[in-house]
C-alpha cells in the first residue's frame, strides 16, 4: 500500500508543488503537510505598484495605486479584504484571473477594474475587452486609467453648495476642474427644482438659450478665455450662477452632472503645465491635500 501518508508511494513529495489559495498559504505552512511537501505556492499572483506581493508583504496593498491579480482566486473575498480600506487605489488589473473572478469593491469609488475577457458582469467602472458599459466618477476621489478603453457611458457629478454666492464677477464662485473625457452634456437642477441642461457662454457672451447658462474658462497666454468646449485632460475654471440678484430658474444648486456617450478614454497622461500670462495651471486627477 501507500502507507499512512497521502504523499508517499508512487511519487516523492519533495519533488512536488502544492498550490493553495493566496490567503491560506500560512495555514498550510503551519500544518504537518508542509513538512511532507515543502514546496507550497499560492494559486494567485499579486503585485502592488509593480512590486510582487507575498503573503508576508500584503501590507503593500494598503497604499498601492495599481494592483494586479492573476491566476486562480477561490479566496477572492479574502484577497479583496487586503486592500478594502485603500482609498488610493485607482486600478485593479484582473485580466489574468483564470477562475473564480469576482468584481472587488474598492474604497475609492473611481477605481477601474480591468476584468478577464470571459467576465459577464454589469458593475460600473469595469472594463472588459477594452470596453466599459458605464463609468461613474465621484468628486474628490482619485482617478487614473493605466490603459485606454471605450466607455459606452461616462459621467462625473459635483455638488454645488447652496450657501455659496456665485457669478462671473465673484472670485469665490470659481472652481478648478479637469475630467478624463470630452464632455458632451451637462445637467443640473435649478433653484426652482427643475432639471435643466447647461450651456457655457462663449467669448461674445452668447449661449444656447434653450439651456441654462454657466461660465467656463480656459487658460491662454493672454489670460483666461471663455470657451464652450470641454475637452478631456484639460484644466478649466468653472462657475455656476447662484445669486439673489438672479432668477431662481437661472440659479444652479446641488448636483451638476457632466457626461458623454461612446467616449474614448485615453491612458491618463503625464500632465504638463498650461502657460498663462501671469501664472500657469497644471491638471491632476489625483487627490491633493490643501
List each model region and its residues.
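Solvent-exposed loop and capping/linker segments of extracellular ligand-binding repeat ectodomains
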Residues: 1-145
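Polar low-complexity intrinsically disordered regions enriched in Ser/Thr and small residues
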Residues: 4-6, 12, 38, 74, ...
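Surface-exposed intrinsically disordered loops and tails
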Residues: 47, 128, 194-197, 201-224
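Generic serine detector
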Residues: 5, 24-26, 31-32, 54, ...
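Extracellular/luminal ectodomains and secreted, surface-exposed scaffolds of diverse proteins
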Residues: 53-55, 75, 210-217, 236
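A short, polar beta-strand/turn micro-motif
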Residues: 116-195, 220-290
Amino acid at each position: 500500500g501507500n502507507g499512512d501518508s497521502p504523499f508517499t508511494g508512487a511519487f516523492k513529495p519533495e519533488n512536488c508543488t502544492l498550490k493553495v489559495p493566496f490567503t491560506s498559504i500560512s495555514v498550510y505552512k503551519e500544518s504537518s503537510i508542509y513538512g511532507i511537501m515543502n514546496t507550497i505556492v499560492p494559486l494567485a499572483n499579486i503585485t502592488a505598484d509593480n512590486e510582487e506581493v507575498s503573503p508576508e508583504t500584503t501590507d503593500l496593498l494598503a497604499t498601492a495605486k495599481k494592483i494586479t491579480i492573476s491566476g486562480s482566486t477561490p479566496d477572492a473575498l479574502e484577497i479583496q479584504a487586503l486592500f478594502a480600506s485603500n482609498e488610493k487605489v485607482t486600478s485593479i488589473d484582473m485580466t489574468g484571473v483564470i477562475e473564480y473572478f469576482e468584481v472587488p469593491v474598492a474604497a475609492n469609488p473611481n477605481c477601474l477594474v480591468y476584468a478577464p475577457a470571459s467576465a459577464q458582469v454589469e458593475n460600473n467602472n469595469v472594463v472588459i475587452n477594452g470596453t466599459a458599459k458605464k463609468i461613474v466618477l465621484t468628486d474628490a476621489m482619485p482617478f487614473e486609467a493605466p490603459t485606454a478603453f471605450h466607455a459606452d457611458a461616462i459621467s462625473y457629478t459635483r455638488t454645488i453648495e447652496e450657501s455659496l454666492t456665485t457669478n462671473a464677477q465673484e472670485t469665490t464662485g470659481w472652481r478648478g476642474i479637469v475630467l478624463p473625457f470630452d464632455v458632451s452634456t451637462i445637467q443640473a437642477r435649478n433653484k426652482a427644482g427643475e432639471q435643466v441642461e447647461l450651456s457655457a457662454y462663449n467669448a461674445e457672451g452668447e449661449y444656447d438659450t434653450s439651456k441654462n447658462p454657466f461660465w467656463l474658462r480656459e487658460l491662454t497666454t493672454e489670460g483666461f478665455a471663455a470657451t464652450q468646449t470641454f475637452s478631456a485632460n484639460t484644466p478649466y475654471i468653472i462657475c455656476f450662477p447662484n445669486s439673489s440678484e438672479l432668477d431662481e430658474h437661472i440659479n444652479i444648486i446641488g448636483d451638476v452632472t457632466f457626461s458623454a456617450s461612446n467616449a474614448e478614454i485615453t491612458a491618463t497622461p503625464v500632465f504638463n503645465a498650461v502657460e498663462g500670462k501671469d501664472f500657469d495651471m497644471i491638471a491632476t486627477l489625483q487627490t491633493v491635500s490643501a
